């Protein structure tokens, strides 16, 4: 069990509350310095009270060093997964990094992100010339998609999982693994559907030995 503590909020239009990092007190003006302190305290509090290290979303690659010592998992979201700096930064991390499929639902984009993260790179990070050795624990997260009409396209069904398994088989990737995000476009943002979706994913996993190896877990929202 990894508590999911997301301290940043990606906004589709750039407007609205952007999370604890930007605005630790919603009733006051944004304060990034106070936000950095607040997000560290949040993750440390979870560790102290539960004994469980937490997960966060890497929305801003240059900020992840503020939490480098307190996280055990990071996810790269649907709107960031095609960004090169996110992929390169993930290649230098020593914890598992999950790459979500983009909002279009395109699985090839997600897998290309995993390929990039698993390879070594040489790039500029926070003003420094850095080299990475690649992150063999980079993997995929299925979160569903949205078509051009704004309709949700779930990708947690048995056929979707088998399609991902087949695509993994065509790539030279280490440690093939997938997490199913049972909210977002997989549930149509109907949080009560998560229980049913988890049951279906577990059934598919138990039914097929290949999926039992590939599907490592589920991601839920409270």
Please identify what each model-predicted range represents.
Residues 2-163, 184-185, 189-200, 204, ...:
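Active-site-facing alpha/beta catalytic cores
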Residues 180:
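Conserved, mostly hydrophobic/aromatic
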């Amino acid at each position: 069990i990894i508590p999911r503590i997301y301290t940043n909020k990606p906004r589709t239009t750039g407007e609205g509350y952007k999370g604890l990092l930007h605005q630790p007190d919603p009733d006051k003006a944004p304060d990034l310095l106070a936000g950095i302190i607040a997000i560290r305290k949040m993750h440390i509090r979870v560790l102290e009270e539960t004994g469980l290290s937490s997960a966060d979303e890497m929305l801003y690659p240059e900020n992840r060093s503020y939490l480098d010592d307190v996280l055990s998992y990071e996810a790269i979201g649907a709107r960031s997964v095609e960004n090169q700096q996110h992929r390169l930064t993930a290649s230098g991390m020593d914890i598992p990094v999950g790459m979500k499929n983009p909002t279009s639902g395109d699985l090839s984009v997600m897998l290309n992100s995993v390929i990039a993260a698993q390879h070594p790179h040489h790039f500029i990070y926070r003003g420094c010339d850095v080299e990475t050795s690649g992150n063999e624990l980079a993997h995929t997260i299925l979160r569903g998609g949205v078509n051009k009409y704004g309709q949700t396209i779930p990708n947690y069904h048995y056929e979707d999982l088998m399609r991902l398994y087949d695509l993994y088989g065509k790539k030279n990737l280490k440690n093939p693994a997938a997490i199913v995000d049972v909210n977002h476009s997989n549930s149509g943002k109907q949080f009560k559907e998560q229980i049913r979706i988890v049951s279906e994913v577990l059934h598919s996993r138990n039914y097929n030995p290949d999926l039992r190896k590939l599907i490592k877990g589920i991601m839920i929202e409270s």
